[in-house]
Design a protein with these regions (language model features):
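Walker B catalytic acidic pair
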Residues: 123
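Conserved core segment of the aminotransferase class I/II
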Residues: 142-198
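Conserved core of the PLP fold type I
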Residues: 1-114, 126-140, 144
Length: 198
């Protein structure tokens, strides 16, 4: 359990890089609006990711902002050079969840075009949306989920969050498929934590 959602983000970025799943300069997608650390962290010198933003620009005919994404903008996720997508769902600060149509489109793209896409979903505002459904429920093998207790319990001072990952996931598989030299480095790194670090 990390020290709140912000710390969880730092651990996730570091872990993905330290385990050779994201490399400096890799393409990632940020769904905006987004909690600001997701904007700031990728620009730090140790990451310098190539960030592509998908903005929630959809509006109704009478000019009401729906805080949803245009389906055509999701096509950027088809590109296998896009390694990860960071989604704050429900959005922060507007607190709008992804529509079922958008969720279905993301699922379709991952299954048909980019099966190794790592999805990091920040579900901290989930309790504010009736009948909320996380990306983790739709794409459990691809999704890392961040959840913080501060919003639900109104206790921001607690600084307590969780990072959830399905037991059967692409992250472990991609680590197993790394070149032998990188696997050896990881085996050495984790040997103090596990009798079987492989």
């Amino acid at each position: 359990a990390p020290d709140g959602g912000s710390a969880a983000m730092c651990y996730i970025f570091d872990s993905l890089q330290q385990n050779f799943l994201l490399n400096k300069g890799d393409k990632i997608v940020l769904f905006a609006p987004v909690f600001t650390p997701y904007i700031e962290i990728p620009e730090q010198a140790r990451y310098l990711f190539n960030v592509i933003e998908i903005k929630a620009l959809k509006m109704t005919k009478d000019g009401y902002h729906t805080w949803q994404y245009q389906e055509k903008d999701l096509d950027v996720l088809k590109d296998p050079s896009v390694k990860a997508a960071f989604i704050t769902n429900p959005s922060n600060p507007p607190s709008y969840g992804l529509t079922k149509a958008l969720m279905n489109r993301i699922v379709e793209i991952v299954r048909n075009d980019n099966p190794n896409l790592m999805i990091i979903t920040d579900d901290v505002y989930a309790t504010f949306i009736p009948h909320f459904r996380s990306m983790m429920a739709e794409l459990p093998k691809n999704t890392l989920c961040v959840y913080s207790f501060s919003k639900y319990f109104g206790a921001t001072g607690w600084r307590l969050a969780i990072i959830a990952l399905h037991q059967d996931n692409i992250y472990d598989r991609m680590i197993r498929e790394l070149p032998r030299d990188k696997q050896e480095l990881l085996k050495k790194r984790y040997s103090s934590l596990s009798l079987h670090p492989e």
